[in-house]
Curated annotation (Swiss-Prot):
The gene is KIN2. It catalyses: L-seryl-[protein] + ATP = O-phospho-L-seryl-[protein] + ADP + H(+); L-threonyl-[protein] + ATP = O-phospho-L-threonyl-[protein] + ADP + H(+). PANTHER family: KP78A-RELATED, MAP/MICROTUBULE AFFINITY-REGULATING KINASE. It comes from Saccharomyces cerevisiae (strain ATCC 204508 / S288c) (Baker's yeast). It is found in: Cytoplasm; Cell membrane. It is a peripheral membrane protein. Residues 99-377 form the Protein kinase domain. This is Serine/threonine-protein kinase KIN2. Interacts with SEC9 and SRO7. Coiled coil: none annotated. GO terms for biological process: exocytosis; positive regulation of exocytosis; positive regulation of IRE1-mediated unfolded protein response. One of its GO terms (cellular component) is plasma membrane.
Length: 1147
């Protein structure tokens, strides 16, 4: 930063101030070829000594020396004339410290406001740049001739004092902003004084001005205006309790945050008031100024804020100001008379409040206490608007802190520390203050349940010291000490301005100290963890070096190299294992580096629910010793990976993370590549003969790993001719660290989990399954299927959401790329709440991923030719029938809300992540509803189910596909409905009406071929790879496909729409091209994947109608809306279908 005493932001560095106070060029200017140069290093404060012109390179192209002399002489002549002042250009700063200036968001006569961004933290704030008035005036005076007489000198001195007063107001605004701490007051973090400007760093309020909001929306409903009014009243209570008056309260100075809360800004006209004195400064905006200001009458302070508050409230509920006229004189008279017209739509209560606030006589005007306690302000609330004043205690001379006084001096609240100390002692020893303090402690003692009253020596008692400490640290909203009381005057609130400033500064110092202590504690904790990690690494290295086995050295060297540079991996110290194992020889084996998961409970996924786990829950204390006896553990936990938060943080800070992301697309070409060890991960289970997997693996399927697979954990795939999972290891083989290849081969030499891991996990699974079975009342046959699911989950390569526990940890390479570039699959699969966690019976067969390798069929879910078992259709239809029966039930709204309340967080993504919109007039009565979101969601699912529309629930809504029968309906069985409430006749009427809308020319061969080629061109932009599944097969359990197959070929592809659903998502959820990726719309019913327009019976197929239903939350008005969006298909049919769905929804 430049030094204000040595550097000014002038254009030409050759001009220096002469002794007479005027600017004149130095002789060096005549020898310098640079006539006008930008700011040099000396101006920027980077060069303190005299500049050597001959050694410094020119900053501009050289000019003619003769011309430079003439220009310099001309400037010297201009300086001698009164109107020939030298014009000085200001230096325009582009950054301040680590804050980079982005854009100007506001400007005025005093300065401008710029949006800034921190280089390291990327935090967004705003900087208010205010001109230093006195410095600008002095610069201007330097260019003028010297005063000629004494009167001119006095006039200039008076003007200078006026400019200095302006700077004092700016400094006062900055000082008050730094000590104020209230949720409805915009924070001021720091102020920096430069040579010509003041820079004030403010909190960024992204919602805009309340003025813009009123212009856009007009007058507000009273319950919305009440929310804003309570925020304003809360902020004014805080200010007035600290002897601060705003004096410029208006809708332009009230901001709205992104969460809908108000923030008061612009304390440039604020001042400190005293109830014993009066103020004489008349300031404010004309429309919101109190009549006593226009009449130039002295005032105390709070009453002018009450008047302005009343005008603001009137604007909120009426959409206009109460006093308005083009002529300012007439406007003055209207304000002084105070006659207000109230519209007829206002309630009696709000009119009653406004008529008490907008009163010309300040003595008859309502106080802030009356406003806060008014019935209109508290309608719909159980409490009055809080002031958020922290708990305070009356001061004594012994409690005055020198550190607080120094901070007050630094902020320029006081001029002398010792004088202020004496003033404070005089105030706290006044008889009135001591009496109020005694009453305060008596009242507090009664509130705390203490029988004895406090005497004058209460501070010397240990019990009373404890009382003071507990009172200060308690919640102000619970203590009730600062509630207004007509019979009691609180000595800690607005007793004297000096005491109030002392309390505010003391609280600011306490906040800074607490923040510093937290930072120091985090730093010490990080250092301790780093030392512990270094000790663990050193111990592991020592053990490895002392071992003579070359196999162990080879297997241990790679993970240790990965552990050293990564401070985020914490491992348990290596401890020798017991020699009781029958399968391993531990006499010459190094100890295992195994991680124990901090919790075996299974919380919700961090990336699928807003209520994600805290990092403190992830980095809990690790257990110490693991028994070496291998225990049979479910393969589900063989590849437990770290939390997505931890993994993402580590990948951002490691070169390996960059290469890992780059190499995601090519992993399938390197089946033997190893990956670095995982933080907080359980190693794979040691597979021995004594702990065989209880599930048979009759089939195997090779699955490649892609960056588009949203697996939270990757199960080992079973590749043909790979290592047998039951194979017994060699007698002297060692337990190597986990090795994960891209093909996910099973390794027989893997360490075991803790002995109690399976027990706890199985108990939790049984508990979850039992709750779901009790809720849905599944029969004994379904119970057998569920048990088979639990046993067979080890062989499941797809990530079934209905059986995945909450909050599973993610490997860093398996996480989504970023929040802004999230994979669409990871944003889709969540658990529908009403069939709470129904395990589909098709999971036992894996529905294709464990099918025979020689039976290849087109699998729309994985968008490739994967193996699908022949009986996959049976399971899918059974699951869909179950879901149909559940959502077809006529449930009451109360039952729906009860089911929704029992659902875990993130299980209803369509309403957990609704899109908020402010567009007025965008929705109609038909597309909006005042019903709760769970009821709207249930109605949508019920209607789609009754209409046999395949759908998938994703974040923010539903993705739907309407499969239509072919033209020649006589050759194909008629589609029947399985839903309850929509009979066959009604379904056929809808079907016939939709069929009649479609002309036969639309289904001509030429049109189909053209459409097919168009879809293929879209698929060329797909950011995926062939043979890479886009979604886990578990998506079938979240879709509706209750249609009876039209043909044997179609029956084998009952899940055909799943592929289309997996390729689409809502636009605002993801940022990829997800309209149609291939020509799968034409070959859904084609077993061999051939792109044909006719099925095996020669019947022409009609392209399906694909559309999205967005669930939108309309802000302010509190309504839920639905928004339809067509993806593909006939537009006229889509319009008719959407209209029919809206009619059935009956929102």
């Amino acid at each position: 930063m430049p030094n204000p005493n040595t550097a000014d932001y002038l254009v030409n560095p050759n001009f220096r101030t002469s002794k007479g106070g005027s600017l004149s060029p130095t002789p060096e200017a005549f020898n310098d070829t640079r006539v006008a140069a930008p700011a040099t290093l000396r101006m920027m404060g980077k060069q303190s000594g005299p500049r050597n012109d001959q050694q410094q390179a020119p900053l501009m192209p050289p000019a003619d020396i003769k011309q430079g002399k003439e220009q310099a002489a001309q400037r010297q002549n201009d300086a001698s004339r009164p109107n020939g002042a030298v014009e000085l250009r200001q230096f325009h700063r582009r950054s301040l410290g680590d804050w980079e200036f982005l854009e100007t968001v506001g400007a005025g006569s005093m300065g401008k406001v710029k949006l800034v961004k921190h280089r390291q933290t990327k935090e967004i704030c705003v900087i208010k740049i205010v001109n230093r008035a006195s410095k600008a005036y002095l610069h201007k005076q330097h260019s003028l001739p010297s005063p000629k007489n004494e009167s001119e000198i006095l006039e200039r001195q008076k003007r200078l004092e006026k400019e200095i007063a302006r700077d004092k107001r700016t400094v006062r605004e900055a000082s008050l902003g730094q000590i104020l701490y209230h949720p409805h007051i915009c924070r001021l973090f720091e102020m920096c004084t430069m040579s010509n400007h003041f820079y004030m760093l403010f909190e960024y309020v992204s919602g805009g001005q309340l003025l813009d909001y009123i212009i856009q929306h007009g007058s507000l409903k009273e319950h919305h205006a009440r929310k804003f009014a309570r925020g304003i009243a809360s902020a004014l209570q805080y200010l007035h309790a600290n002897n601060i008056v705003h004096r410029d309260l208006k809708i332009e100075n009230i901001m709205i945050s992104s969460s809908g809360e108000i923030k008061i800004i612009d304390f440039g006209l604020s001042n400190i008031f005293d109830y014993r004195k009066q103020l004489h400064t008349f300031c404010g905006s004309l429309y919101f100024a109190a009549p006593e200001l226009l009449k130039a009458q002295p005032y105390t302070g709070p009453e002018v804020d009450i008047w302005s508050f009343g005008i603001v409230l009137y604007v909120l509920v009426c959409g206009k100001v109460p006093f308005d006229d083009e002529n300012s004189s007439i406007l003055h008279e209207k304000i002084k008379k105070g006659k207000v017209d109230y519209p007829s739509h206002l309630s009696i209560e709000v009119i009653s409040l406004l008529t008490r606030m907008i009163v010309v006589d300040p003595l008859r005007r309502a106080t802030l206490k009356n406003v806060v306690e008014h019935p209109w302000m508290n309608r719909g609330y159980d409490f009055k608007a809080p002031s958020y004043v922290p708990n305070r205690v009356p001061l004594t001379p012994e409690m005055i802190d020198s550190q607080v006084l120094k901070e007050m001096y630094r902020l320029e609240f006081i001029d002398d520390i010792e004088d202020t100390r004496r003033s404070l002692i005089r105030l706290v020893t006044e008889k009135e203050y001591i009496q109020l303090s005694q009453e305060y402690w008596d009242k507090l003692s009664n509130a705390k349940g203490l029988s004895s009253s406090l005497n004058n020596n209460y501070l010397n008692s240990t019990a009373q010291q404890t009382l003071i400490q507990n009172h200060i640290t308690s919640n102000p909203s619970q203590s009730g000490y600062n509630e207004p009381d007509s019979n009691f005057e609180d000595p800690t609130l607005a007793y004297h301005p000096l005491l109030s400033i002392y309390h505010l500064v003391s609280e600011m110092v306490a906040r800074k100290l607490a923040k510093l202590q937290r930072r120091q504690a985090l730093a010490l904790q990080a250092q301790a963890q780093q030392r512990q990690q270094q000790q663990q690494v050193a111990l592991g290295t020592k053990v490895a070096l002392n071992n003579n086995s070359p196999d162990i050295m080879t297997k241990m060297r790679s993970p240790q190299k990965e552990v050293v540079p990564n401070p985020g991996i914490f491992q348990v110290p290596a401890i020798g294992t017991s020699g009781t194992s029958n399968n391993t020889n531990t006499s010459n084996k190094p100890p295992l580096h195994v991680m124990v998961p901090p919790k075996l409970t299974i919380p919700e996924q961090a990336h699928t629910s807003p209520t994600s786990r805290k990092s403190s829950d992830i980095h809990t204390e690790l257990n110490g010793v693991l028994k070496s006896t291998p225990v049979p553990v479910s393969g589900e936990y063989q590849q437990r990976s770290a939390s997505p938060v931890v993994g993402e943080h580590q990948e951002k800070n490691t070169i390996g993370g960059i290469f890992r992301r780059i190499s995601q697309s090519g992993q399938s070409q390197h089946p033997t590549r190893q990956q670095e060890p995982l933080p907080e991960r359980e190693p794979p289970t040691y597979m021995s003969k004594s702990n065989e997997i209880s599930i048979k693996v009759p089939k195997s399927h090779s699955r490649t790993i892609s960056d588009y697979i949203p697996s939270a954990r990757r199960y080992p795939s079973y590749v043909p001719n790979s290592v047998d999972v039951k194979q017994k290891p060699a007698k002297n083989t060692t337990i190597a660290p986990p090795i994960r290849s891209v093909s996910q081969k099973q390794n027989s030499d893997l360490p075991a989990l803790p002995q109690n891991a399976e027990l706890i996990v199985q108990k939790q699974r049984q508990k979850l399954l039992q709750e779901n079975l009790d809720k849905l009342q599944i029969n004994d046959n379904d119970n057998n299927n569920v048990n088979a699911v639990v046993d067979g989950i080890n062989n499941d390569n797809s990530d079934h959401y209905l059986s995945v526990p909450k909050g599973r940890k993610l490997h860093p390479s398996a996480r989504a790329k970023s929040v802004g570039h999230a994979r669409r699959e990871s944003l889709k699969f969540t658990r529908p709440p009403i069939p709470a966690a129904l395990p589909p019976s098709d999971m036992t067969n894996d529905n294709g991923f464990l099918g025979e390798a020689n039976k290849e069929r087109y699998n729309p879910v994985s968008s490739n030719f994967s193996t699908v078992p022949e009986d996959s259709t049976t399971y899918s239809n059974d699951t869909n029938n179950r879901l149909t029966s559940v959502y077809s039930q006529e449930l009451t709204e109360k039952q729906i809300l009860e089911e929704a309340s029992k659902a875990p967080p993130g299980s209803m993504p369509s309403i957990d992540y609704p899109k908020s919109m402010f567009l007025k007039g965008f929705f109609s009565v038909q597309t909006t509803s005042s019903k709760p979101l769970p009821i709207v969601r249930h109605n949508i699912i019920s209607v789609l189910t009754r209409m046999n529309i395949d759908f998938k629930e994703v974040k923010g809504g539903f993705i739907c596909v309407q499969q239509r029968p072919s033209i020649e309906t006589a050759a194909v069985p008629v589609i029947t409905t399985t839903g309850v409430g929509l009979d066959s006749g009604k379904a056929m009427d809808l079907q016939n009406s939709l069929d009649s809308q479609l002309s036969s020319s639309y289904h001509s061969t030429a049109s189909s071929a053209s459409r097919n080629s168009s879809i293929k061109r879209q698929g060329s932009y797909k950011r995926g790879q062939n043979n890479i599944p886009l979604t886990p097969l578990a998506t079938n359990t979240h879709q509706r496909n209750s249609s009876i197959p039209m043909s044997p070929n179609y029956g084998n592809q009952s899940n055909g729409t799943s592929g289309e659903l997996s390729s689409m998502s809502l636009d605002y959820v993801q940022q990829q091209d997800d309209i149609l990726t291939t020509s799968r719309a034409q070959n859904i019913n084609n077993v061999n994947g051939q792109t044909e327009q006719t099925n095996t019976s020669g019947i022409k197929e009609r392209p399906p109608i694909k559309f999205e239903i967005h669930i939108v939350k309309v802000r302010i008005v509190g309504l839920a809306g639905v928004h339809f969006k067509k993806v593909s298909g006939n537009t006229w049919l889509y319009k008719e279908l959407a209209s029919y769905i809206l009619k059935e929804l009956n929102l």
